[in-house]
Curated annotation (Swiss-Prot):
Segments forming domain Macro: 1-175
Protein name in UniProt: Macro domain-containing protein lmo2759
Family from the record: Belongs to the MacroD-type family.
Stretches that traverse the bilayer: none
InterPro entries: Macro_dom, Macro_dom-like
CDD domains: Macro_OAADPr_deacetylase
Length: 176
């Protein structure tokens, strides 16, 4: 399994599934969520509304999968990251859960490639370095435990230079 880091637009990734940094209502919004909803087209919002009508809401740390509308990917996994408060409200555990559950959903559909944004580091205010550490640690731990998986590539798509530098530095460190 390969873990790669790129700078780019998550909506343009040619992978089986992209992960959306979603809100609990799955209704689109700003940042990554808004960009994905806009690029995927109106059918995505309809499908998300059907999911919410069925489950009520998607709390922080959880994830659901939908089709990808007009995107190059086949599926979108909507992972709801935590809003950063002070680090004393299970924020890191909820963030780790987003990555773990997204990988489980992708593997459950026998997908081979998944692209993640930097979940919760925008308007949700999660410290970027800590978020990168949690993300890299979690996907590595998942890969160790799920070594017999269909997933061959886990890609982190960094929108900004700061996250790109953090991920590139951390991927080669012993910290994660």
């Amino acid at each position: 399994m390969e873990i790669t880091i790129v700078k780019g637009d998550i909506t343009e990734q040619e992978v089986d599934v992209i992960v959306n940094a979603a809100n609990s209502g799955l209704l689109g919004g700003g940042g990554v969520d808004g960009a994905i909803h806009q690029a995927a087209g109106p059918d995505l919002l309809k499908e998300c509304q059907e999911v919410i009508n069925r489950i009520g809401s998607c709390p922080a740390g959880e994830a659901v999968i939908t089709s990808a509308g007009d995107l190059k990917a086949t599926y979108i996994i909507h992972a709801v990251g935590p809003i950063w408060k002070d680090g004393e409200h299970q924020e890191a555990n909820k963030l780790a859960s987003c990555y773990w559950k997204a990988l489980d959903l992708a593997a459950g559909k026998d997908l081979t490639s998944i692209a993640f944004p930097n979940i919760s580091t925008g308007v949700y205010g999660f410290p970027k370095k800590l978020a990168a550490e949690v993300a890299l640690y979690t996907v590595r731990k998942w890969a160790e435990e799920e070594y017999d998986t269909s997933i061959k590539e886990i890609r982190f798509v960094c929108f900004d230079e700061e996250n790109l530098k953090l991920y590139n530095k951390l991927i080669n460190s012993e910290v994660v």
